[in-house]
Every structure is written in structure tokens, then in C-alpha cells.
Regions:
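A shared catalytic/ligand-binding motif for oxyanion handling
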Residues: 1-222
Length: 222
């Protein structure tokens, strides 16, 4: 039986682009991913993930999307969010009407925060993808922005952690947003000063339109 109360501690989270389910049959990859409390598998190209691969986790799915009308067309994108079973009682899925997004509301009792925290896991197809031929919104980051607004409309202004593969190149630029998750410790153990924005050092110095928009969204909702 899972306890409904825990002593707040560091929570581990990762986003990992698997480019199809075949990579999950590598034992070393599964061992690495299984260590995390929350593990977002990106680009599953599938509608499900075999549950026996991660017996210690519950699996939350948003299926891939066919980019053509052909029934035989391969699914594109797709997410699977693994949640360790001892954490699952502290997690509520928030259903949203967007492809390639998973939203969870995580209890303050797990994180030691004053409010629940929203996890928003995302895969954005690149700007050149034919996916955008079938949508009203041509900039994928604008979909994230609208999803955040929907969550705020439902739950108020909760702290939010955004993670995934955005196909957004930000170079060495950073947003003006600080880490404002309202807890007395760094829940992810990322830095000594959890409320500062670290200096980015990236080998990819290019900034694209998705990247600029993403930085603006981070600042907008800080």
C-alpha cells in the first residue's frame, strides 16, 4: 500500500527522446530511465508503451499523430510519462486538447510546496513539419502558451515546470524568469541558489523563432 504522506525530498525528473520504442529494449537504457521519479519519453511514434518494460512505474500516454490520412502512415511524435508508483497517489492528470502534451498536477505534499505544481511535458514538431499544415496555430510554442493559459483558467496561477523537446534553439540566451517554485529547498537539486537563472553555455549558438518565442513565454509566466 502506498502511503499518502511523505517527507519532502528531491524529486528526479528527465525528458528523453527515444525516437521510437525499439530503444527501450536496451537494458542499459531502461535501467537509466527507471531511476527517475518522472520520466518523459519523447517521440514514441506509438499509441502505447508495453507496461512490462517499466514495472515500477505507471505509464501515462498521449499517442503519436499521423501526418497523412493514410491508415498505414507511421505515427509521428507521441509521449509517454513514467511516474514511479510510490509517487502516483500524489499526481493528478489534467486532460488537455492538444497533441503531444501531458499535464500533471503534483501534490504540494510530495514536493513540500505551498501550492500544487503543474508539470507540462511537451513534444513540438519542428517548424518545417507538415504537422502545422493541419493546425490553426503555425507556431508550436503558441500551443504551449495556450495550454498554460487553459491550465491557469482551471486551477489558477500555480507554479509550473515545463519540460520536453521543443525543437526550439535558444543558443546561449536565457529568459528573465527565475525559479519561483515556492519551496524552502531546491526540489530537483539543480543548484545552490534555486531562485537564480543560471548562465547558459551551449555548443549550439543558433537562436530560431521557436527559441525566441519559448524564452518570451518563460518570461511571460514567470
Amino acid at each position: 500500500m502506498v502511503s499518502n504522506s511523505v517527507t519532502p525530498n528531491h524529486v528526479s525528473l528527465v525528458s528523453y527522446n527515444i525516437e521510437g520504442l525499439s530503444s527501450l529494449y536496451d537494458a542499459d537504457t531502461r535501467l537509466y530511465l527507471s531511476a527517475f521519479d518522472f520520466c518523459l519519453l519523447v517521440e514514441t511514434f506509438a499509441s502505447s508503451v508495453p507496461s512490462h518494460l517499466f514495472p515500477e512505474h505507471d505509464v501515462i500516454i498521449t499517442p503519436g499523430v499521423r501526418l497523412t490520412e493514410a491508415v498505414t502512415a507511421r505515427l509521428s511524435g507521441g509521449l509517454a510519462l513514467l511516474v514511479k508508483k510510490q509517487r502516483s497517489s500524489f499526481v493528478e492528470r489534467v486532460h488537455v486538447e492538444y497533441d503531444n502534451m501531458i499535464v500533471l498536477k503534483v501534490s504540494k505534499d510530495l514536493l513540500g510546496t505551498e501550492k500544487p505544481v503543474v508539470l507540462l511535458g511537451v513534444y513540438l514538431p519542428p517548424s518545417s513539419s507538415s504537422y502545422y499544415h493541419k493546425t490553426d496555430i503555425q507556431n508550436g510554442v503558441a500551443m504551449i502558451e495556450q495550454c498554460i493559459l487553459d491550465v491557469i483558467g482551471s486551477f489558477g496561477d500555480l507554479p509550473l515546470i515545463l519540460f520536453g523537446d521543443f525543437n526550439a534553439r535558444t543558443g546561449n540566451e536565457n529568459s528573465d524568469a527565475a525559479d519561483t517554485v515556492d519551496c524552502g529547498f531546491d526540489i530537483f537539486g539543480n543548484s545552490e541558489d534555486a531562485h537564480s537563472s543560471p548562465h547558459r553555455v551551449s555548443k549550439d549558438t543558433v537562436v530560431n523563432d521557436f527559441g525566441r518565442y519559448l524564452l518570451n513565454v518563460c518570461t511571460e509566466f514567470a
